[in-house]
Amino acid sequence: MTNQDNYCVIMGGGIGSRFWPFSRKTLPKQFLDFFGTGRSLLQQTFDRFQKVIPTENIFIVTNAMYADLVKEQLPEVSENQILLEPARRNTAPCIAWASYHIRALNPNANIVVAPSDHLILKEDEFLAAIEKGLDFVSRSAKLLTLGIKPNRPETGYGYIQIDEPAGENFYKVKTFTEKPELELAKVFVESGEFYWNSGLFMWNVNTIIKASEDLLPELASKLAPGKDVYATDKIGRASCRERV
């Protein structure tokens, strides 16, 4: 039985410019069946999280221009689960906006935030890590990211350097490094202290909102006044009018 306090936010608003010409602005990569499975990357991501998150607790944040594509590919998702961005503002506003919305639904919510375009081969191990991470953030006011043990020096990924342990298989983060040069990537891998940054995050909703208020006060000041709109049928109309 899935935990009703657990939520998922799938970020699906990118235009996938690095995969041009396969991925285009009108049909970006998350809506494509890249691997011939019969399911797009977005659909595979939804299917994956549906195994550990209640269906009604999975939200898709996407650009308003992709609303019809999301509805077509995920007919089991209600309109209230599709949060439409009026403009692309990158990750922080996307996460903060979804968090305010989810807190209005459930002030005890634990959230996993995931890109819509990941390929996951060891799905059982992945989902076990997600469940363990959500349990951790439900008991700890920490921001959690999922690291992947590197098997080669890769310059296309970000790296996380771990610090002291914070529990079994949990570590404090010492540094983040975005896409290092090859020689530095080799040093990272050989040290055993670095993990690839997966781009997946987990936290309790109150923890992330407090972090937004403390670290991004200008952003939080724009989102906090919407408390009467979040978790209502006004959210779609408001999101298409207001630019953050």
Name these PLM-found stretches.
Residues 119-123, 152-157, 184-185, 209-210:
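Short, well-ordered, mixed-charge alpha-helical segments that flank or form enzyme active sites
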Residues 10-12, 61, 112-115, 145-149, ...:
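Short beta-strand segments
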Residues 1-10, 18-25, 36-115, 121-127, ...:
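Conserved N-terminal catalytic core of the sugar/cofactor nucleotidyltransferase
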Residues 122-154:
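Conserved donor-nucleotide/metal-binding helix-loop-beta segment in metal-dependent transferases, i.e.
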Residues 159-241:
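Catalytic core of tubulin tyrosine ligase-like
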Residues 47, 51-54, 75, 100-107, ...:
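Generic secondary-structure signature for well-ordered alpha-helical cores
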